[in-house]
A protein has these predicted regions:
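Exposed loop/turn and edge beta-strand positions of beta-sandwich/beta-sheet ligand-binding modules
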Residues: 18, 30, 65, 104, ...
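Extreme N-terminal starter segment of soluble prokaryotic enzymes
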Residues: 1-4
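Mid-domain Rossmann-like dinucleotide-binding core that forms the NAD(H)/NADP(H) cofactor-binding site
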Residues: 82, 122, 126-181
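Glycine-rich beta-strand-centered segment in the early N-terminal region that forms part
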Residues: 23-41, 52-94
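Conserved hydrophobic/aromatic beta-strand scaffold that supports enzyme active sites
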Residues: 19-24, 68-70, 99-101, 107
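Cytochrome P450 core scaffold surrounding the K-helix E-X-X-R motif
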Residues: 44-50
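Short loop/helix-cap segments at secondary-structure boundaries that form the rim of catalytic
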Residues: 16, 81, 100-102, 179-181
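NAD(P)H dinucleotide-binding glycine-rich loop of Rossmann-like/cofactor-binding domains
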Residues: 47, 58, 86-150
């Protein structure tokens, strides 16, 4: 079976994105293959494509930090229970493709009824918000939290985390958008 993916062979603007056809990958031992339904598009991918992201990438590479798709093949030793399940992952590379093979422990089940496009919008955004809160902000239970622009990024904000996690969660927004509250 053939599959398509995007490849970056040299750094630059969008003109360096090349669509190539290859044989579809098959999962190695302990891996699952995901037929990708949705892939996120982020500023980090733009920086990688241009060669200026702090995490250097070896050329050629397939961009795509975050994906959602259906598990359609299991490698030796991987759980067949995941076959047919909707999953999300943060592979950093390889998401701009029809298929990706990843270690089973890098996949997270997407709850039944959640739209794949909505789900993929949460993967990188949520991880980024979580890291900002905990790695940089050292947020801990009982603290007050201010989220700049949080009203419009609810899915990745502390406001969606378990009730009672923070003492108060405050959103800050501009006067221009205050009529939308």
């Amino acid at each position: 079976m053939k599959s398509l993916r995007v490849v970056v062979r040299r750094h630059g603007g969008p003109e360096v994105l090349e669509i190539v056809e290859d044989d579809a990958p098959h999962p190695a031992s302990g891996e699952l293959r995901v037929q990708i339904i949705a892939a996120g598009v982020s500023f980090a991918e733009l920086l990688m494509r241009e060669g200026i992201h702090p995490e250097k990438t070896t050329l050629p590479f397939t961009p795509g930090w975050d994906i959602v798709g259906i598990v359609d093949e299991a490698g030796e030793g991987a759980s067949h229970a995941m076959l047919g399940k909707l999953v999300a992952a943060l592979p950093i590379h390889g998401g701009y493709a029809q298929f990706i093979c990843l270690p089973e422990d890098e996949l997270t089940s997407v709850p039944t009824g959640v739209d794949p496009i909505e789900a993929v919008s949460l993967v990188l955004n949520y991880v980024t918000a979580y890291q900002m809160m905990h790695r940089l902000g050292h947020a801990s239970p009982g603290q007050r939290v201010l989220i700049h622009g949080g009203r419009w990024c609810r899915h990745g904000s502390a406001a969606t985390w378990p009730p009672g996690r923070f003492r108060d969660v405050w959103d800050c927004l501009s006067f221009r958008s205050s009529d939308r509250i």
